[in-house]
């Protein structure tokens, strides 16, 4: 058993008491990102090693793997703790997003180790989508690079407010303060173009040698700030979803018998109480909460992030993809939106194309109307383009086949974030964050029967070359 884990269990008075204590610790999700070979995997390995989170058999295996695949000579190659794919070990790089878990006396952590190569930017965006903090590694010898800027921008685009700029490999520049100061100034100059509400911190360190990772460095006495671990343990994470109105996307209709009908999902934001009046979108029908069912039994109130099943007092038509919110809240469904897109496919994104889109539990089709601009990650300027290439980031105008209940992504990532799915291969080809909503066309001016709407959708889906217009919106072909 891990020695520090055994000591923690003993200090708490047994396994059960230790598990209860773990449940009450706050959780921080963070990712490491930056350019290739900046030392992201090594840093995570060092964090795990210096916090004594590695079991004896893992340490023994690491010694053997370091001899076969290591890139650090006689030293332990801590990056091998994270780089698990055979291709990663052979090339000495990270390709996939690797997740690791550890805890200290103050906090629990989930780490996402993301790749640095530009062609794997899509993997980095995937890792960043669930994180609260980003560690941006910079090689002290190279300074701020294009990929550093790209990852910084993607992190802020995905709503991350806390950035820790870890200037790594200080041992290779003789721990010089002027090198740290120069890179810090360069990054702050670039960061002037990022959102103004960011919490940016700088830590000089050496992941290989352990300087300023979990313990203060004797080689950089000119630095009086906290170590990286101290920053992670003390950073104050304020979750925006706790302060946002109630949003409950229905993932599953739970009907185990004739006497029970519940609507299961994860509460995306806000809170809900028994007896509270709620409204169902897109239908607009209202009811009230009769029960809040959880794995541990019924509750009187649930908060954001909890997996629950809601039982209502009325039998109303609710299905997967519907959204429940407080009855006094106003959220008008929209068919048109401007979306920040991170494109992840070899085939460029271009106007006129149609994709399936998935938002929470809702799946529908969307058409690309226009690309307003692509963002140049070197200087964050906007440029006109006809298409968005692989790993490109831009603002795109879209029209959905049906009105959707959407929020702005920065206000609610669950109901404001979506993915693009190729209709033929069923592969995820892009990620989108709602920037602007346009409610025009959300309600049709002409009433059509259910049969007419179903027939129209059938024709547009299976016979796109007929160029049939969408009865619920603008005239266009459903390509």
From Swiss-Prot:
One of its GO terms (molecular function) is GTP binding. It catalyses: sulfate + ATP + H(+) = adenosine 5'-phosphosulfate + diphosphate. PANTHER family: TRANSLATION FACTOR. Pathway: Sulfur metabolism; hydrogen sulfide biosynthesis; sulfite from sulfate: step 1/3. GTP binds at residues 34-41, 113-117, 168-171. Pfam families: GTP-eEF1A_C, GTP_EFTU. The keyword Cell membrane does not apply. It comes from the Bacteria. Heterodimer composed of CysD, the smaller subunit, and CysN. Belongs to the TRAFAC class translation factor GTPase superfamily. Classic translation factor GTPase family. CysN/NodQ subfamily. Residues 25-239 form the tr-type G domain. NCBIfam families: CysN, PRK05124.1, small_GTP. This is Sulfate adenylyltransferase subunit 1. InterPro entries: CysN_GTP-bd (IPR041757), CysN_II (IPR044138), CysN_NoDQ_III (IPR044139), G_TR_CS (IPR031157), GTP-eEF1A_C (IPR054696), P-loop_NTPase (IPR027417), Small_GTP-bd (IPR005225), SO4_adenylTrfase_lsu (IPR011779). Residues 34-41 are annotated as: G1. GO terms for biological process: hydrogen sulfide biosynthetic process; sulfate assimilation. Residues 92-96 are annotated as: G2. It comes from Salmonella paratyphi B (strain ATCC BAA-1250 / SPB7). Residues 168-171 are annotated as: G4. Residues 113-116 are annotated as: G3. With CysD forms the ATP sulfurylase (ATPS) that catalyzes the adenylation of sulfate producing adenosine 5'-phosphosulfate (APS) and diphosphate, the first enzymatic step in sulfur assimilation pathway. APS synthesis involves the formation of a high-energy phosphoric-sulfuric acid anhydride bond driven by GTP hydrolysis by CysN coupled to ATP hydrolysis by CysD. Its EC number is 2.7.7.4. Residues 206-208 are annotated as: G5. The keyword S-adenosyl-L-methionine does not apply. Keywords: ATP-binding, GTP-binding, Nucleotide-binding, Nucleotidyltransferase, Transferase.
């Amino acid at each position: 058993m891990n020695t520090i884990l055994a000591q923690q269990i003993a200090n708490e008075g047994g396994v059960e008491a230790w598990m209860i204590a773990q449940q009450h610790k706050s959780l921080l999700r963070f990712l490491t990102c930056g350019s290739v070979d900046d030392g992201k995997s090594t840093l995570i390995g060092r964090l795990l090693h210096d916090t004594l989170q590695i079991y004896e058999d893992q340490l023994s295996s690491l010694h053997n793997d370091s001899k076969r695949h290591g890139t650090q000579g006689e030293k332990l190659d801590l990056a091998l703790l994270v780089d698990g794919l055979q291709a990663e070990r052979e090339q000495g790089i990270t390709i996939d997003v690797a997740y690791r878990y550890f805890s200290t006396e103050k906090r629990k952590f989930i780490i996402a180790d993301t790749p640095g190569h530009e062609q794997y930017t899509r993997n980095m965006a995937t890792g960043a989508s669930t994180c609260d903090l980003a560690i941006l590694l910079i090689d002290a010898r190279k300074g701020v690079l294009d990929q550093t800027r790209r990852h910084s921008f993607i992190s802020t685009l995905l709503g991350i407010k806390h950035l820790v700029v870890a200037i790594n490999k200080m041992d290779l520049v003789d721990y010089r303060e002027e090198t740290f100061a120069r890179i810090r100034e360069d990054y702050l100059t670039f960061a002037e173009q990022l959102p103004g509400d960011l919490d940016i911190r700088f830590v000089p360190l050496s992941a290989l040698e352990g300087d300023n990772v979990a313990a203060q460095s004797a080689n950089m006495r000119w630095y009086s700030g906290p170590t990286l671990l101290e920053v992670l343990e003390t950073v104050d994470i304020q979750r925006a979803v706790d302060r946002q109105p109630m949003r409950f996307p229905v993932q599953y209709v739970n009907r185990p018998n004739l006497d029970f009908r519940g609507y299961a999902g994860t509460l995306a934001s806000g809170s809900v109480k028994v007896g509270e009046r709620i409204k169902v979108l897109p239908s607009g029908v209202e009811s009230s909460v009769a029960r809040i069912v959880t794995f541990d039994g019924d509750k009187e109130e649930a908060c954001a992030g909890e997996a629950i099943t809601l039982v209502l007092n009325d039998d109303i038509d609710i299905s997967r993809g519907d959204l429940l919110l407080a009855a006094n809240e106003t959220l008008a469904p929209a068919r048109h939106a401007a979306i920040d897109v991170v494109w992840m496919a070899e085939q460029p994104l271009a106007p006129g194309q149609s994709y399936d889109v998935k938002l929470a539990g809702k799946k529908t089709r969307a058409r690309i109307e226009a690309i307003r601009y692509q963002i140049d990650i070197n200087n964050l300027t906007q440029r006109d383009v006809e298409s968005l290439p692989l790993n490109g980031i831009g603002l795109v105008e879209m029209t959905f086949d049906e009105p959707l209940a959407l929020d702005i992504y920065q206000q609610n990532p669950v109901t404001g974030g979506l993915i693009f799915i190729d209709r033929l291969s069923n592969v995820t080809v892009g990620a989108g964050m709602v920037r602007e909503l346009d409610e025009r066309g959300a309600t049709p001016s002409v009433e059509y029967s259910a049969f007419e709407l179903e027939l129209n959708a059938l024709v547009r889906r299976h016979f796109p070359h007929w160029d049939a217009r969408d009865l619920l919106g603008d005239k266009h072909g459903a390509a």
